[in-house]
Amino acid sequence: MPHRQKLAKIELVEKYQVRRAAEVEHERAVAVYDLLEENYFAPNGDFIGPYALYIKLEDTRLIFDVRKEDETPLVQVPLPLKTFQSIVKDYFMICESYFAAIKKSTPSQIEAIDMGRRGLHNEGSELLRERLGGKIDVDFDTARRLFTLICVLHIRG
């Protein structure tokens, strides 16, 4: 029997339609696809999944709007956006360095930057798991993909 504590649907909710670079849209699509293929997502309470998750930025908060698969609202988990701003900013900076390095650097230089990028991504994932602690339980791979989506939400175009 497949586990039921998982996401069956995930959407980024944005007030305005944002046109992002093709690379960013590709990263978003891959993160969503990978999440739906395999994830562990268990909101605190007597809830039984699968779940639909809507992630949105609202004022100074990141909102995880969790619903049943049939869209019945279950719980909204607000997280302070400030918690993630620094790590997202650092992550974007290292990604820019990585993409610049691909064009002109040696393979060993690219690999070093990529290791740093992955390390920062892992740090953001752990921070997300920590902030969701006691509210929503997620495994590390799920947190990594959710962190990718949080980064996508921060891109304004």
Swiss-Prot record:
Family (UniProt): Belongs to the UPF0262 family.
Lineage: Bacteria, Pseudomonadati, Pseudomonadota, Alphaproteobacteria, Rhodospirillales
Pfam families (alphabetical): UPF0262
Designated name of the protein: UPF0262 protein amb3341
